[in-house]
Design a protein with these regions (language model features):
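N-terminal [4Fe-4S]-dependent radical SAM core
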Residues: 1-22
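Canonical Radical SAM [4Fe-4S] cluster-binding loop centered on the CxxxCxxC motif
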Residues: 15-53, 107
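Glycine-rich, often proline-containing surface loops adjacent to acidic residues and nearby aromatics
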Residues: 16-18, 33, 66-73, 172-173, ...
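Short glycine-rich or small-residue beta-strand-to-loop segments that form or flank ligand, phosphate
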Residues: 21-23, 73-76
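Conserved AdoMet/S-adenosylmethionine-binding subsite of the radical SAM
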Residues: 57-60, 64, 80-225, 229-237
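Short Fe-S-cluster ligation motifs
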Residues: 58-75, 240
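Residue-level recognition of the N-termini of beta-strands and the immediately preceding loop/turn
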Residues: 70-72, 102-105, 142, 243-247
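Auxiliary Fe-S-binding modules of radical SAM enzymes
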Residues: 191-323
Length: 323
């Protein structure tokens, strides 16, 4: 994206109308180095405070120019790798601007599960939580998008205490994870994990389809199997855990939700819809692909009826870069 004066913003992504992703330059690493991660290593080594100030101002200006944006998602890497004093430079800039369109600040992080001490005993743990409180007291909703890949990650006392301390600030924790072959491709585990998350006061949010990273051939789960795992787990939990959605692919046209396998006019098909789309008119529109038990991504699927999916022409015209 860019500002109206032509300034290009390299640390941002505005794919969906209401949500802006922001990549602080100081968050381009993580407490964990998951081999299935889809965020490639990014730049470091700049004059941190100076760069943060400038980025914060540009983010505010972009939000002023785009009143349709209600949510800012801090991502990376992992924003919680930053010291609290550095992270607050960004959040204070947003709060001080008193933007009427900004309703929610989201933080995508693995720290809750992988390094809970960020919120317990690190030198800036208390300052981090005070910053969370400040955001909430401003009237802005704070959502911690916590990555939990397995039930066992919820079993330790530090994890439970970190969740408690975060929730005491008024922040809400929503949980998400990719479905990973050899790791968590088990419906019973997912059901128990969602139930445990609810018991700890968290909200199950997404089951993702693992992206096309270097390890996809190991971690990838066929879409048909992924949907069956999700559906089986979904049936085992109460309504409080049925806030979760999936399996979802963050593909080029948007977040593609695999609804299930059906039969139309004697033809076995896969039913899908967009939970988020490059164009808001695409969201919620059902579409169908030929049944393919080996497909692991949207690109592997073929339209069940016609030669193209309904969004393809507009996607190609508006969003495909030409040489």
């Amino acid at each position: 994206p860019q500002l109206k004066d032509g300034t290009k913003l390299y640390g941002m992504q505005h794919k969906y109308d209401e949500t802006c992703l922001f990549f602080p330059s100081q968050s381009q690493t993580c407490h964990a180095y998951c081999s299935f991660c889809f965020r490639w290593p990014q730049f470091v080594g700049m004059d941190e405070m100076k760069f943060a100030m400038r980025e914060g101002e540009q983010l505010v200006q972009y939000l002023k120019e785009h009143p349709e944006i209600s949510d800012v998602l801090f991502t990376g890497g992992d924003p919680m790798i930053m010291k609290a004093s550095m992270f607050s430079v960004y959040t204070d800039a947003l709060l001080d601007a008193k933007l009427p369109n900004l309703k929610t600040i989201r933080i995508g992080t693995k720290a809750v599960s992988y390094w809970p001490y960020k919120f317990l005993t690190d030198s800036d743990a208390d300052e981090t939580l005070k910053n969370f409180e400040k955001i909430v007291k401003s009237g802005t909703h704070l959502a911690i998008m916590a990555h939990f890949n397995h039930l066992v990650e919820l079993s330790t006392d530090p994890i439970k205490e970190a969740i408690k301390r975060i929730r005491n600030t008024g922040a809400q924790i929503r949980t998400q994870s990719p479905l990973l072959a050899h790791i968590n491709d088990d419906a019973d585990m997912w059901a128990k994990m969602w139930q445990k998350q609810v018991s700890l006061g968290c909200i199950p949010y997404y089951m993702f389809v693992v992206r096309d990273t270097g390890a996809q051939q190991y971690f990838g789960v066929p879409l048909v199997k992924a949907e069956k795992i999700f559906r089986t787990a979904f049936r085992k939990v109460s309504g409080l855990a049925r806030t979760v959605r999936g399996p979802s692919m963050s593909a080029t046209p948007g977040k593609v939700h695999v609804l299930g396998v059906s039969e139309i006019n004697g033809q076995k098909v896969m039913a899908l819809q967009l939970l988020q789309g490059r164009e808001s008119e695409w969201v919620g529109v059902p579409f169908f692909a030929k049944y393919d038990e080996n497909a692991i991504w949207l690109d592997d699927l073929e339209p069940a009826f016609g030669k193209k999916f309904f969004f393809e022409d507009e996607l190609k015209t508006k969003y495909t870069k030409t040489a």
